[in-house]
Design a protein with these regions (language model features):
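Bacterial N-terminal signal peptides that target proteins for export
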Residues: 2-12
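Hydrophobic helical h-region of N-terminal Sec-dependent signal peptides
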Residues: 13-17
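N-terminal signal peptide c-region/cleavage motif recognized by signal peptidases
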Residues: 21-23
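Transition segments tied to proteolytic processing and entry into folded domains
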Residues: 2, 25-308
Length: 308
């Protein structure tokens, strides 16, 4: 490696390694645990595309999309392995690479980007210790611009490089469109309070679950009980009444906001129902909602639902 390239790699390494110092929770992933190194862990960068079996899930892609200032389709033109001693924090079985890529398309973002750029990424070695062959491969990068360093990008998480395919790009574009639409649901940050109020008839009543949001706007879940019928519930991301009986469909942004960011248990003191039985019913309704939402599955190691 030339002395000039040594200096470039050293400078860029300092920028890219800043990713490790930023917990993923600060990038909008509740309960997330950052990976041990750039590009490490299941689904490591460049090992699979966004539609392969066992690959990134809806939640993974939504996490990356919300963290990224730029989503870029690029073709890798050059890979230079960084010596391990110049790659602090490198996980075992990984290698750090100085990548040169040619821009194919700017899928999302407003920051200017040139015809080519450089970035750092960690990639898994195979069983024989061989490096992956990604030259001329198209990839999707979830990144941010580096202030004062035109021509450099910084991946937003360790797994923010993924192999490109037409299906993968279409999936990313669909999720981005939902996240960026004018009526996209606000980010949920927790549970403010919940209460069950019984009705006039035995078995009749309603649980209201009021949610905290990032921008302080209204959001709530309503669970309605009628005698002889299964509980019905819905969510409202505004001051309007919840659409009872029409809960969010899986793999929608509404579902993502709830399934991936509601805690497993409401925080202590948030259940404000008047009596013991009412508090038990409110807690049971909360568990029912979580059960119907199902698991927020992630394969990129970026977090899970938190404990209350």
């Amino acid at each position: 490696m030339s002395s000039k390239l040594h200096r470039l790699v050293a400078n860029l390494a300092g920028v890219a390694l800043a990713v490790q110092a930023v917990p993923v929770v600060a990038q909008g992933v509740t309960g997330g645990n950052s990976g041990p190194g750039i590009g490490s862990g299941a689904g490591a960068a460049g090992s699979r595309d966004l539609t392969s079996a066992g690959g990134p899930t809806f939640a993974d892609i939504a996490d990356l999309s919300e963290s990224a200032g730029l989503v870029v389709k690029a073709q890798i033109r050059k890979m230079v392995r960084v010596e391990d001693e110049r790659a602090p924090g490198l996980a075992q079985g990984m290698a750090r690479f100085y990548m040169t890529a040619q821009t194919q398309a700017l899928i999302a973002g407003k920051a200017p980007i040139g015809e080519s750029f450089v970035y750092l990424v960690d990639l898994p070695l195979d069983a024989k210790g061989k490096v992956p062959k990604l030259k001329k491969q198209d990839v999707l990068l979830f990144a941010r611009a580096v202030p004062g360093r035109p021509g450099e990008l910084q991946l937003v998480t360790p797994t923010a490089q993924q192999l490109w395919s037409e299906q993968a790009e279409a999936r990313v574009r669909g999720i981005l469109q939902s996240l960026l639409s004018g009526n996209a649901p606000v980010k949920i940050t927790g549970v403010r309070e919940l209460m069950y109020v019984p009705g006039n008839l035995a078995g009749q009543g309603e649980t209201q679950i009021f949610l905290n949001t990032k921008d302080g706007s209204a959001a709530s879940i309503t669970v309605h009980h009628e005698p002889g019928a299964a509980p019905a519930w819905g969510v409202s991301f505004s001051e309007l009444v919840a659409d009872i009986g029409n809960p969010p469909r899986p793999e929608t942004v509404e579902w993502y906001r709830l399934a991936c960011f509601l805690p497993n248990n409401p925080p202590q003191g948030t259940n404000v129902a008047e009596g013991i039985e009412e508090r038990r019913q409110a807690a049971a309704d909360y568990r029912m909602v979580l059960g119907e939402l199902g698991e927020c599955r992630r394969t990129l190691g970026q977090g899970a639902r938190t404990q209350g």
